[in-house]
Structure formats: structure tokens, C-alpha cells
Amino acid sequence: MFTKQYYETLERSQKFQQQSVNWAGYGSYQYVDQLRSIVKEHCCQNMLDYGCGKGLQYTDKNNFADLIGIEQYALHDPAYDQHASMPKGTWDLVICLDVLPFVPESDIDAVVDLMLSRCNKICVIVLQEITHVKTKKPLVCVKDHAWWQQKLSHEKVQLIWRQSTVPFDYSKFL
């Protein structure tokens, strides 16, 4: 299903995940308002978080799913052992927040197809405006808006763009 490059990138991502406090999942909180609106608009009751990181946003006292109005959720992140297995079933909402630039270009279609195969209503994909690639994170697919818009053009996909220069204050949720 995936290319050799995907598995090589996944191995780098797994090492990064093990050695870093990043990818804990707390970045999800910055999308609470947008996702809450989407959940209401599409009457979503359950959700798959594809690329959830360590998933700490779901163990926090301010549970991310509760904040956006989701009753049931499942977690998947191939780079983190505890969430590496893909949950069975389909979900009203599939979210993929700041994940796709870590997937090789040759595997984007396969990953998106996998997410859409688990999606009943809406798949929300968040992409960050990346202006430079000086990072320890294993970015492999840095593309412009037009490329992503064309690549992710599907009736179930809703794109959210975020600017990398906007600071985010987690404290209002913790």
C-alpha cells in the first residue's frame, strides 16, 4: 500500500516521536472553535484523529473531544506505538491536523484514500503555511496552497490553513 520512502520516513518520525516532547497532541487545541463548528454543522458524533501524536490532548483535564462536542473517538498515529494500529470502523469526522507534510509526496494519495475510507461525513485536514524548512521534524512534502488544493480536492475534504507565524496560547485550554 505504501512506498519504501513512506516506511523510511515513518522510521525517522518514530525516532523523532520517541526523542521529543513535540507531537504530544496539544497543538490540536488551537482548532477547537473551528472543529466545534464543523461538528455541529455536520452533526458528527464520533471521530478518528489520524496523526494524533502521543494523544495527550485526550487525557488532559480539558479533553479535546469534549471541547469540540464529540462523544466517541479513536486515535491513530503510525509514528507512535500506542496508537499505531488503525482502529476498525468508520467515523463521522476524520481529522488530520498538521500531518500530511510528514508524508512523502508519493504516498499522499494513499494516506488520503485511507482517511476517506474511514470517513462517513467530513474529513478535516489542517495544513500549515511553511515558509522555511529549517526544522528537526522530518518534513518531506512541502508544497504551496495551489498544490494542496488540487491534491485534496474531494467533496468530503475541508482544508484549514494556518500561518506558522501566529503564536498560540495553550493556557486558555489548560
Model features per residue range: what roles?
Residues 51-54, 98, 103-104:
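Generic secondary-structure microfeatures
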Residues 46, 95-98:
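Hydrophobic transmembrane-helix microenvironments that flank and shape a buried ionizable site
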Residues 1-90, 109, 141-147, 163-173:
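Conserved N-terminal segment of class I S-adenosyl-L-methionine
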Residues 82-84, 91, 95-96, 103-174:
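S-adenosyl-L-methionine-dependent methyltransferase catalytic module, highlighting the catalytic core
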